[in-house]
């Protein structure tokens, strides 16, 4: 045994120098102790898939960097020394490929299980660790095991080729105490432990590399010969009265336009370029809740990423983050507008597949796209599509476009044998590079068509963009969602993909709403969104520095002490540090007088800043509504606060994708009021809440966050009551006109204030809540009290403008 271990020691010491030059790995997760909940006070051993000194030394480097025990240092238990690592399989040589569990590993597991039998307090944590040399997926048709043992020469080649693309993956701990208590401590349990570890390692590799990639020609041939596409080609030839061959060529061209051409080498090179780019333009990337997604990938889920869409940067950022978190970059549905040279071919090789804006009147295109998407799901590739259908121009989450969601459920109705899970993703920035363009488009300027010149002009503007945020929201397991919503859904499974059951549309709409709510739940609060919210709430878009810090502190305290959701994130810095950081991004005017600094926004920046405020307005909507009620009423009963919130909440919930159900509101109001009282903004005596006059400004600025939204509701409701004869389309149009007038007279810059889409969705909610009947006519007995309540919540001068405008409409 000694000669063998001294041989190992010699080979390890000889390997150290070349490996220090050739190997630069990434640990996943980067902070395993925190992410995997490893108890550093309990003993730790490591399990590796194959006997390999190279893997062991690579693991040693990353374990020590992460603050974990050195795998090469013995583990001392009750005065006995144990090896701190086990190999689950032997290493093949050039002459043999023994894949059995090494006897010394079984012996170590057995000895440790015996120790657990003797010492009831002992709990050794086994950390499975995989060292992956390169993450290149295989090609279709090359059926090899996902995790392969490499002999000496193969390992040397792997280190030379992929030493810089090495991934050290730590997995959740396996408790030997749990194994001993649940399964006993005999020798067969040691074998079972080794078998479980082997399956686990294979899944690890699949999660990191993804399934084998299709040969494009084979994929095309398979799809072109599928019954659904053959039928669509025949229908196309018949309806257009063209030869079958011509229709086939058309179908092939469509497939060529749509299909991705994924290239691992491009992803690898792109990763380096993007790493350089992010370091140049962002001060940091903040990634949250990635461990949840890693677990899903490892458990074999078909993952569909559904991010919000703020910027063209989103495509690159999410793929980069997933790759760095040890997952496979997804196939991304990209708008056909991005298929221009040279971006189109690059995106395509990075995993983009292209989608036209509309499928209307194109049954052949629709069928081919649906079949291609179903093929991606069937083969197990992760997919990403932007739920809003386009970039948000206002910074608010747009209502979902449901076409891709419907096609996802249709793919499930073919009988997919794997669970499908939606992963909502919130992407946030302290600077969105297109924000100036968005403001122009909202003022009526035509959207500039994407082209190479536009890309170059954008690249020229790249500078300090502050922080970027990628928050993974709470996943939505679709099989579970369908079981709850449509228990009989499996009866509609049809391998041909023709199934369009009646339950599809309402179910997809419900799913879309849940998906958008989960995206907003994962919002990232940052310095820019907080400062923009505070400055825009002040009438002159200006605050003394001390007051700005005080206001940001109020928002932070509210969000920390009454957390919005488990997946939203807050900065850890103080309000003072956040204001300092926001200033460094160069968007504010700072003037100094004898009494200190005044921070303000010029007219143009005021418009742009609404974008950042809108990113987090939903997080502060309810405390803002409570504050506005208190500012207008001065003193009010708790029951009145609860009743007002309950009355207005359905509109806010629909518009801002808020997460709370009606039955949670009363308790939530009490928690918000208690926090406002803790901050000294209000006092609570018995059942009455009264504002604290000394702190009126802080409460007023909090209330003004939601005041423009309430003004919009007041316009719609009072128009409805004063002109009950108007139809829905006329009501939407007139509401928009009154809002535009109000905006001009009162200096409201928010582009969404008179957005037609926002009014359209408001009238849908009015009907759902019973303020309009089935014919769209006003139900006066419910609408009148609400219209009065909304008037009471807004400022008198704004109310007068609305009343004057409504008189002119009525005339």
UniProtKB/Swiss-Prot annotation:
It is a peripheral membrane protein. Pathway: Phospholipid metabolism; CDP-diacylglycerol biosynthesis; CDP-diacylglycerol from sn-glycerol 3-phosphate: step 1/3. Its EC number is 2.3.1.15. Its main location: membrane. It is found in: Cell inner membrane. Pfam families: Acyltransferase, GPAT_C. The HXXXXD motif is essential for acyltransferase activity and may constitute the binding site for the phosphate moiety of the glycerol-3-phosphate. Keywords: Acyltransferase, Cell inner membrane, Cell membrane, Lipid biosynthesis, Lipid metabolism, Membrane, Phospholipid biosynthesis, Phospholipid metabolism, Transferase. GO terms for biological process: CDP-diacylglycerol biosynthetic process; fatty acid metabolic process; phospholipid biosynthetic process. Belongs to the GPAT/DAPAT family. One of its GO terms (molecular function) is glycerol-3-phosphate O-acyltransferase activity. GO terms for cellular component: plasma membrane. It comes from Vibrio cholerae serotype O1 (strain ATCC 39315 / El Tor Inaba N16961). This is Glycerol-3-phosphate acyltransferase. A motif (HXXXXD motif) lies at residues 309-314. It catalyses: sn-glycerol 3-phosphate + an acyl-CoA = a 1-acyl-sn-glycero-3-phosphate + CoA. It comes from the Bacteria.
């Amino acid at each position: 045994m000694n000669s063998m271990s001294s041989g190992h020691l010699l080979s390890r010491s000889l390997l150290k120098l070349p490996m220090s030059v050739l190997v630069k790995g990434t640990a996943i997760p980067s902070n395993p102790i925190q992410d995997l909940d490893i108890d550093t006070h309990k003993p730790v051993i490591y399990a590796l898939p194959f006997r390999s000194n190279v893997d062991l030394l690579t693991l040693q480097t990353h374990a020590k960097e992460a603050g974990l025990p050195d795998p090469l240092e013995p583990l001392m238990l009750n005065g006995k020394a144990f090896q701190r690592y086990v190999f689950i399989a032997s290493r093949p040589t050039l002459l043999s490929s023994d894949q059995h569990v090494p006897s010394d590993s079984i012996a170590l597991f057995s000895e440790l299980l015996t120790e657990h039998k003797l010492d009831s307090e002992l709990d050794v944590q086994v950390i499975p660790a995989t060292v992956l040399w390169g993450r290149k997926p295989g090609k279709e048709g090359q059926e090899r095991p996902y995790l392969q043992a490499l002999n000496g020469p193969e390992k040397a080649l792997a280190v030379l080729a992929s030493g810089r693309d090495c991934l050290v993956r730590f997995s959740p701990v396996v408790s030997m105490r749990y194994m001993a208590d649940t399964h006993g401590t005999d020798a067969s349990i040691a074998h079972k432990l080794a078998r479980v570890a082997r399956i686990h390692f294979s899944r690890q590799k699949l999660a990191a590399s993804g399934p084998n990639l299709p040969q494009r020609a084979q994929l095309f041939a398979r799809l072109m010969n599928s019954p659904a596409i053959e039928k669509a080609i025949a229908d196309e030839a018949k309806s257009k009265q063209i030869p079958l061959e011509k229709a086939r060529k058309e179908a092939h061209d469509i497939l060529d336009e749509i299909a991705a051409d994924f290239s691992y080498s491009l992803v690898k090179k792109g990763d380096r370029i993007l790493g350089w780019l992010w370091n140049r333009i962002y001060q940091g990337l903040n990634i949250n809740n990635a461990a949840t997604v890693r677990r899903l990938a490892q458990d074999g889920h078909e993952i569909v990423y559904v991010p919000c869409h703020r910027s063209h940067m989103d495509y690159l950022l999410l793929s980069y983050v997933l790759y760095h978190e040890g997952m496979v970059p997804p196939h991304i549905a990209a708008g056909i507008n991005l298929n221009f040279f040279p971006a189109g071919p690059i995106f395509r090789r990075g995993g983009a597949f292209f989608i036209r804006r509309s499928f209307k009147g194109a049954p052949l295109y629709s069928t081919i796209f649906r079949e291609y998407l179903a093929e991606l799901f069937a083969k197990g590739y992760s997919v990403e599509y932007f739920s809003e259908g386009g970039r948000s121009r206002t910074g608010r989450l747009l209502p979902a476009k449901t076409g891709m969601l419907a096609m996802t459920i249709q793919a499930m109705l073919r009988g997919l044998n794997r669970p499908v899970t939606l992963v909502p993703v919130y992407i946030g920035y302290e600077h969105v590079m297109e924000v100036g363009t968005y403001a122009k488009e909202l003022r009526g300027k035509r959207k500039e068509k994407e082209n190479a010149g536009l890309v170059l002009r954008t690249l020229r503007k790249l500078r300090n963009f502050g922080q970027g945020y990628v928050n993974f929201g709470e996943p939505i397991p679709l099989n579970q969602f369908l079981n709850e919503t449509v228990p009989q859904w499996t009866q509609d499974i049809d391998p041909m993909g023709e199934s369009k059951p009646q339950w599809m549309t309402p179910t997809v709409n419900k799913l879309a709403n849940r998906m958008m709510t989960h995206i907003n739940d994962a919002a990232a609060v940052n310095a820019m969104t907080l400062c923009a919210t505070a400055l825009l709430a002040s009438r002159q878009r200006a605050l003394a520095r001390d007051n700005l810090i005080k206001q940001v502190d109020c928002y932070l305290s509210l969000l920390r002490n009454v957390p919005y959701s488990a997946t939203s994130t807050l900065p850890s810095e103080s309000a003072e540090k956040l204001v300092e950081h926001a200033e460094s991004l160069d968007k504010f005017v700072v003037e100094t007088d004898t009494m200190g600094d005044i921070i303000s926004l010029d007219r143009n920046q005021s418009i742009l800043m609404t974008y950042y405020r809108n990113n987090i307005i939903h997080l502060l909507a309810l405390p803002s509504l409570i504050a506005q009620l208190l500012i207008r009423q001065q003193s009010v009963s708790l029951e009145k606060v609860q009743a007002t919130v309950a009355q207005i909440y359905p509109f806010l919930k629909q518009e801002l994708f808020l997460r709370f159900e009606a039955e949670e509101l009363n308790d939530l109001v009490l928690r918000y009021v208690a926090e406002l009282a803790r901050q000294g903004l209000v006092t609570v005596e018995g059942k009455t809440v009264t504002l604290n006059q000394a702190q009126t400004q802080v409460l007023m600025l909090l209330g003004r966050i939601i005041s423009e939204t309430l003004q919009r509701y007041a316009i719609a409701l009072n128009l409805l009551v004063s002109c009950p004869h108007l139809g829905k389309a006329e009501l939407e149009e007139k509401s928009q006109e009154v809002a535009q007038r109000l905006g001009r007279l009162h200096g409201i810059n928010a582009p969404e204030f008179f957005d037609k889409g926002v009014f359209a969705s408001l009238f849908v909610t009015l009907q759902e809540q019973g303020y309009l009947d089935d014919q769209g006519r006003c139900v006066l007995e419910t609408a009148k009290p609400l219209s009065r309540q909304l008037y009471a919540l807004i400022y008198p001068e704004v109310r007068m403008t609305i009343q004057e405008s409504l008189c002119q409409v009525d005339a």
